[in-house]
Amino acid sequence: MKYLFIVNEGAYGSELPYNALRLAMALQKEHQAEISMFFLGDGVTAAMNNQQTPNGYYNLERMMKAVIAKKGIVKLCGTCLDARGIIDENIVKGANRSTMNELAELTENADKVLTF
């Protein structure tokens, strides 16, 4: 089954990005699901690289890399990145700048869409 996760909340401001990534990882592991994730608004901050979190605390960068490593697709709203001054060099390798047209295509191709 193909899942699309749409993540609007910022990194570490709420646990929604964490829960989205956690569920995506579980679906990949237990059900071999095809995962696409689209981060927009403050959600794009979850894709910043070089995140420094305390030992024992979840790290969204590592979680996102795990989703990507299992062939997950991670897209980031380009307009949202620009509005926050986030340049491509500062995002997780494998996460890609994207557009609303790509989000529309991902939505059309998904069996299920989940929003966080």
Functional labels for PLM-detected ranges:
Residues 53-80:
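A glycine-rich helix N-cap at a beta->alpha junction
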Residues 38-48, 79-80:
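Short, conserved active-site loops that position catalytic residues or coordinate cofactors/metal ions
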Residues 17-30, 35-37:
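Histidine-anchored nucleotide/phosphate-binding helix
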Residues 2, 33-36, 73:
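Residues at the starts of beta-strands that form the adenosine-phosphate
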Residues 50-55, 91-93:
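Short glycine-enriched, charge-decorated loop/helix-capping segments at active-site entrances
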Residues 5-18, 47-52:
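Short, glycine-rich nucleotide/cofactor-binding loops
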Residues 83-116:
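C-terminal structural segments of small proteins and small subunits
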Residues 5-6, 36-40:
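Short, conserved beta-strand edge motifs with alternating hydrophobic and charged residues
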